[in-house]
């Protein structure tokens, strides 16, 4: 009742108590995603040898293929690399990328993203804006380390 009188809402609680259990539950994907130069973005026509370098240097175990307009075209994971190992170096990124990857938006609650990662048994996923442009990558380890449950 006092919180309502003072117009103190969940966003205010998160701002003043970000390290607490409730604060972790109120956090958004945008609070944990890696963005900017950290994004593992590759062109669909990129040779897999170059994709491997990008995936290794970025360290997320995932790479996103993008179209010329910058929209997400697909995602390549470590599992995709293992499944295509025999012919990997003769392929291009777009031939391996999953064209229907699991994605989230920056405004999704981090706890919901964690549940999705757990349900799908994946360690990372791409964060896209409302138009489908990659704006971040989210790793399960970052959420667990922060106490999101």
Each model region followed by its residue ranges:
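Generic structural signal for well-ordered, non-membrane alpha-helical segments
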Residues: 6, 22-25, 44-48, 110
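Flexible, glycine/charged-enriched surface loops at secondary-structure junctions
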Residues: 8-11, 65-68, 128
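Tandem CBS (Bateman) regulatory domains
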Residues: 13-37, 72-123, 130-149
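Oxyanion-binding "anion nests"
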Residues: 31-71
């Amino acid at each position: 009742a006092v919180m309502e009188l003072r117009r103190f809402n969940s966003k205010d609680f998160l701002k003043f108590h970000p390290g607490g259990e409730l604060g972790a539950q109120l956090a958004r994907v945008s609070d944990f995603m890696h963005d900017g130069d950290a994004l593992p973005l590759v062109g669909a026509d990129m040779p897999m040898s170059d994709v491997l370098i990008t995936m290794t240097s970025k360290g997320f175990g995932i790479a996103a293929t993008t179209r010329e307009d910058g929209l997400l075209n697909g995602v390549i994971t470590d599992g995709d690399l293992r499944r295509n190992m025999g012919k990997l170096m003769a392929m291009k990124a777009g031939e391996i990328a999953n064209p229907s990857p699991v994605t989230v938006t920056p405004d999704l609650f981090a706890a919901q993203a964690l549940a999705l990662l757990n349900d799908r048994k994946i360690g990372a996923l791409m964060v896209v804006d409302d138009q489908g442009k990659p704006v971040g990558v989210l790793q399960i380890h970052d959420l667990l380390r922060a106490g999101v449950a």
